Amino acid sequence: MNINKPLEILGHVSWLWASSPLHRNWPVSLFAINVLPAIQANQYVLLTRDDYPVAYCSWANLSLENEIKYLNDVTSLVAEDWTSGDRKWFIDWIAPFGDNGALYKYMRKKFPDELFRAIRVDPKTHVGKVSEFHGGKIDKQLANKIFKQYHHELITEVKRKSDFNFSLTG
């Protein structure tokens, strides 16, 4: 293994974070929480053009328990949480140079039969909402059925927790 490869990846991702209006003012501690586990678990995509990074995406495969933990506090995941289950969550999606469409197409092709969710934050209100994404080959009706099952499992489990702070209403 080339020892410089992880450092090179970190450099590329840090460049993208610094170039992203959403990410550039986030603390370094969030970079460590969001990026290092993704690289360690090989749960990321880094798109380059002419050897320059243009887009980055990372995801965690969470258990239901860790999904609830993440929704309650997006800074709560530790390295082992990233590979704790089969419930896929996009953690970072960064395309500051107009390559969002290319990253979207790449991810749909890379994960043709997979489902993902993400917390998307409105940059003006700083309010987050859960969004759903699916691969390019999965049937939309099947995807919706599975997402509904995920929501049912999530809501059922959240109702059992007295310390959950995430709002279940829009």
Swiss-Prot record:
Changing C57A: Does not affect acyltransferase activity. The keyword Transit peptide does not apply. Heme binds at H151. Keywords: Acyltransferase, Cytolysis, Cytoplasm, Heme, Hemolysis, Iron, Metal-binding, Plasmid, Transferase, Virulence. Its EC number is 2.3.1.-. The keyword DNA-binding does not apply. Pfam families: HlyC. This is Protein-lysine myristoyltransferase HlyC. The gene is hlyC.
